[in-house]
Amino acid sequence: MAEKSTVKVDEVKLNLIEMVLRAYDPUYSCAAHIIVKDEKGNKIIEVIKE
């Protein structure tokens, strides 16, 4: 089983990601799961709204 790592993301970066997502998808607020990957496809941020 793969280890799950938790990365702490500061609130400013998280708000910036949210602004960009809302600009492209007005229904973003419906989303519950966001994954951000780098150029190689490695997951760098995962946000789960509860």
From Swiss-Prot:
- Stored InterPro entries: F420-Hydrogenase_large-U, NiFe-Hase_large
Gene this chain is encoded by? vhuU
- The signal peptide stretch is none
Q: Can you say what this protein is called? A: F420-non-reducing hydrogenase vhu subunit U
Residue numbers binding Ni(2+): U27, C30
Its EC number is: 1.12.99.-
Q: Which NCBIfam families does its entry note?
A: VhuU
Assembly description: The F420-non-reducing hydrogenase vhu is composed of four subunits; VhuA, VhuD, VhuG and VhuU.
Organism lineage reads as: Archaea, Methanobacteriati, Methanobacteriota, Methanomada group, Methanococci
